[in-house]
UniProtKB/Swiss-Prot annotation:
Pfam family, one: A_deaminase
EC class (word): hydrolase
Catalyses which reaction(s): adenine + H2O + H(+) = hypoxanthine + NH4(+)
Coiled-coil blocks: none
Residue positions binding Zn(2+): 14, 16, 194, 275
Designated name of the protein: Adenine deaminase
GO CC list: cytosol
Organism: Pseudomonas aeruginosa (strain UCBPP-PA14)
InterPro entries: A_deaminase_dom, ADE, Ado/ade_deaminase, Metal_Hydrolase
Amino acid sequence: MYEWLNALPKAELHLHLEGTLEPELLFALAERNRIALPWNDVETLRKAYAFNNLQEFLDLYYAGADVLRTEQDFYDLTWAYLQKCKAQNVVHVEPFFDPQTHTDRGIPFEVVLAGIRAALQDGEKLLGIRHGLILSFLRHLSEEQAQKTLDQALPFRDAFIAVGLDSSEVGHPPSKFQRVFDRARSEGFLTVAHAGEEGPPEYIWEALDLLKVERIDHGVRAFEDERLMRRLIDEQIPLTVCPLSNTKLCVFDDMSQHTILDMLERGVKVTVNSDDPAYFGGYVTENFHALQQSLGMTEEQARRLAQNSLDARLVK
């Protein structure tokens, strides 16, 4: 069934470009930029990809991102991801990038954006993959820092379709960024936010009511709140679910416990995505395949999940 799933036309709506940095490219960029790495080789780095929680993953993720220095680096990162999309019949992408991960290291905002944007434009021209780029704020940093990042983004307003919110969830509720999101919306941005991954269902309520998001990234803990489930179904609010990420970060102990198909059958508009595929062992097709292998997902369910992803695009 893998080949059939691979050929299914689909969109990817929850993908961090920095999370597509495969070990081989990481080492190549480190060599190009003359950066010493704490790992001896690709295999040693791959062995480090064993996480017990979100924070352990983030620590490695930010360490890996340090090799991204130049416009060409960001182009190469994005282009490698788009080639993977072409191979898996992902026809539309709405990736996140985290400018603060780079500007806090002294990399100018416009350098990061120029490389990513050029690759996305080439992806549309040369590979036929449509896109919309989402600027994501790091929630473990302050509201003031998010406001500064929004200031940096405004001269490039036409480069983005939306703002988002990611990084360490627990202790950083969506309400912390309500004023930033209000301002972003007043500037014409759509909004999305990570909520209900490690954080409680209350964070999903906040994202909907305070940040006024178009869709929820992750959202799997909505299953614990029946009233919230009813709202998601009634309003057809999309959830961008990332199955392999959820098991790798121990949101679910095992894929057999994942609730995505239960949510689908109840009428929630769930989609399948890869989140940080270089770190979690699979791109979109591998995530679909894991659901088929562990949960017995049928072809009909796969078609619905793929159609949900196309329907839930911010750029139609």
